[in-house]
Amino acid sequence: MAKYGSADLTISADVNDMSDYVDTVNDVMIEALLQEGTAFGDSWVEQLSTGIKRGSPVTMEGFFDDTAATGPDVTFNALGTTLAMILTWGSTKTSTFSAIVTNYGRKPMRGELTRFTVTLLPVGAVVEA
């Protein structure tokens, strides 16, 4: 069984490789939506699957870079636009989804390098291959 680390993760946003800029990714989660289905006589809460799934927001962070054509500032500082995201885990496992850029910010700190943060909201299916 192969084990993979951060050096094995590739992050692509549209055609730009963001792997050299991003150093933190929160959970890439897919969830099934549920509805409570507890009846009056039940002593335990029951959950029913609605049959609908969604991807949770993905937050990425790294060092700010304003490289004109491919850096995180030009790629992620486009609020409201949709990006084609591909995360490659190790050799061939991928998570592919379209996501709207909902938040983008720069985080300057005294005595430290400026960082960026971006939140991407998946729209439609998150395809695991």
Show which residues each predicted segment covers.
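Hydrophobic lipid-interacting interfaces of membrane-associated proteins
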Residues: L121-E128
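Short acidic, gly/pro-rich beta-turn/loop elements at beta-sheet edges
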Residues: T70, M109-G111, E128-A129
